[in-house]
Each structure stands twice: as C-alpha cells, then as structure tokens.
Amino acid sequence: MYLMKSLLKENILEEANTWIKSNQKVVLATVIQTWGSSPLQVGSKMIVNEKGIFSGSVSGGCVESSVISESIELIKKNSKFKKLEFEVSNENAWDVGLACGGEIKIFIEQIN
C-alpha cells in the first residue's frame, strides 16, 4: 500500500528536500504531455520515495499507482530516468475516472 503525504506543489519540493537530507532515494515524476481527457495539466508533479510514500499527483488518481511502481523500480535498478506513456480508450475511460479517452506522458527521474 502507498501513502500520500501532500498535494501542494510547494510542499512537494519541501518534502523531497527533507527526504534527500535523510538519505532517502527520491524520484520526481512530471507530466510532460497530455492528449484528450486529462485531469491534470502539463507540469504537474509528484515525488516518490523508495518506501512508496508519495506527495503530489500526476493524474488525479488515474495512473498514480503505476507511476509509483515504476518509480520504485527505477530506484531499485539505480536508473536515472524513464519516460512513461499511458493511454486510455474511450471504452475504458469511466473505469479510471475520465470523461473520455486520452493519453498522458510522464517523465520520472531520480533527484538525489
């Protein structure tokens, strides 16, 4: 299970700084492109630490769990960055809380 700390952008950066100072590994996820129905805009951010604790949001809940899992995997593999792409068809949109289908691209990177 993942634990969310905050949604405010200012708090996200403060939280990341606190985690880094306490020697935790941190991944920053940033929305870099959207198409169609997307609850959050380009530039939305989320941080994730190695324990799965996160602050912020990149999709309003639609793909957060996948982004958290990918972020933890990035830390485990000691990779620096990765681009994630998620597509939701019109038929599946309601299942993830969207009015219609869309696409979201998210860039994740370690910031330690």
Regions found by a protein language model. Name each.
Residues 2-112:
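Segments forming oxygen-rich coordination pockets for charged ligands
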